Amino acid sequence: VLSTAAVAGTEYEILMETYAGHYYPESPDGGCATGPVLPGSYQDPLEEGRRRTLGVCTFGIWNEDAYQLWMDADTLKQVLDKLDPNSLRAAKIAEALENFTLAVDFEQDEAGRIASYRAGREALKPALEAKNGSTTPVFYAVGNAHIDLAWLWPMAETHRKTERTFAAQLRLLEEYPEYKYIQSQPAAYEMCRKYYPELFQRIKEAVKDGKWIAEGAMWVEPDTNMASGEALIRQLLYGKKYYKEEFGVDSQMLWLPDTFGYTAALPQILKSCGVKYLVTQKIFWSYNEGEQFPYHYFYWEGMDGSKITSFLPTSYTYRTDPSELIGVWENRSQKRDLDAFLLPFG
């Protein structure tokens, strides 16, 4: 959004940075391309057939009233679709949505439309303000960005991708004071510090203000099966040192959403390095037709008896709309001893 209070005649200069596509083509079955891009294997510009083209650019006039009305109505419609149609809540939401359709008139002039949008929101307000009961689960939602440091693009693009992601999140933290964002990988932070020092200073301020959560314990988000115990300890040594020196944070949580495996030595290694918690989730994605993992919240006991408190969401790319949240809860593996759920979205 260029402006939420634009004045007629104002001119804007737009600078656009784009990435023209991955070096590797899509797989024959249409799935994700393979990687990573090895040093020296990347041709810039890409040869014909592997080059993407920006073909269409559009713009529109932002109407905050219309957007908020759409959000309200869509939220209630998604909730309604998931409810027992015989429930009182379903009846109340259906009534509110009907009243909304009677209040809104899209055929009026601009002033009339805006007035009707606001009347429509008032019609939906009672249903949106209804309180949940005492047996409703709690979701702890936090923004995150899982940045692959080396996958389908050259390292130079990782630098730019990191900068774009961090800058966008800082803007969101300013726009939404209640928003919290978590970011792992000191390796990514170090790229930012080296190539975008002013941006890095803004991140440090956001960490100090409690808006940006600098956590993760390890230097990167590594595989834990191929790496030796010494390599994993080094990950923790350098990772925790960086968090402490740059952000004043004693990192106590291993944030490992996208690893492909877990060594049985991990609880012992984490405990010995002062890490108390583990968050991961790929076990729900890559089970190769095996039996579904039965828990989300549990103690993982290592070979030496060390215990790590662990929480496994089923994704790190959740949406935050009602249908997603209700679906996450209904499809959870652990049906008992669980009344709250971590929801990393982004």
Describe the role of every protein-language-model region.
Residues 1, 7-346:
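Catalytic-domain carbohydrate-binding cleft regions of carbohydrate-active enzymes
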